Amino acid sequence: VEQLGKNGQMRIESEEWILQDPPVLLQNFSEEDIRDFLAVGDVEKFTLGDLIMREGESGNSACLLTKGLVSIWKNNIHITNLERGSFIGEMFIFNPSKRIANVVAEEDTVVLRFTRKRTLDFFRKKPERLFKIFIINIVNLQQKKIAAMDEKISQLQQKLLQAEQGTQQR
């Protein structure tokens, strides 16, 4: 893992696309608020196979994927892949509980890591409405993740039923 300084070149490059197409957690933030929020995070670089988050470890931070591709693994089972713009571990703001899955870099990857303490300090210095927007964005992100999980469960249930029917016909 290579960490870059707060004003590293990677940070400047990553901000432009974020400002033009904000990730779900930053939607309805002003451009100034987005820039201020991004300044709270630390840039970290990973290469293929690096573990970004480990299942079971303390979840006192979240990551914004600014470059690359990561895979999510639970009990050695591939759950999904996430691309640039994805937030990982966004529930850290409510409760720094244990990580529920491994997050692995599938290629050269860059994240902005936000600690719970620094993020809460950031929102304490801002108008309360910004924190409320952030919380609504977390709820929206969670809803999208739940909908995606529902779809995956439905597909797996269909495959299971087809497999059972195939076994019964033999």
Located regions from the model:
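Cytosolic regulatory regions built on CNB/CRP/Popeye-like sensor folds
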Residues: 1-170
